[in-house]
Structure formats: C-alpha cells, structure tokens
Amino acid sequence: MERTERWALIHAELMAAFKLLPSNTVESDNGYRKEDFLDYINANELLLAMEELDGVIEDNPIPSKEFWLHLISASKLMSNKHLAKYESVLNAT
C-alpha cells in the first residue's frame, strides 16, 4: 500500500471516530480539544490527531466501542501505535 493511500485510510478512520463524539464532549488542556484535533488532522499530523482523540477519556465517559474500533484500525495502519492501550479500553467497555 502506498503511503498516501495509507494516510487517506488513517484520516478516514480518525474522522469516523471524531464524528462519533457527542456534541457536549468536555474539552480540556489535559485531555481532548476539538480545535487541536482539527488542526492536527488538517496538517496531516495523524499520530497527534489520534492521540488528541484518545484524550477524550480524561474528562468524559468512555466513548462507544465503535469509536475505539476506529482508533484500533488507525493504529494498525500506523505500525500499531497505541494498539495495546486502545484494545485494553475497548475490552473494558
């Protein structure tokens, strides 16, 4: 798979996870910030965008299983970055 194709797939997984967040998601400097996520995703900083999304658990209830499945898919496309963490959270939901 070409790099640009992989990036497009990662981008799609991260955006799918983002769209699952409720509109009343709490934002904080220690967790998730919508503006930061969008800045990272638009700059193709996909790992930072993924890490911003996973920060949502700092100040909010654990998102749906579907959310974590999208992060797991993105992680697998990025050489398993944070895969164990995401699988652990998924198994706890």
Kindly label every feature range from the protein language model.
Residues 1-93:
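C-terminal-biased regions
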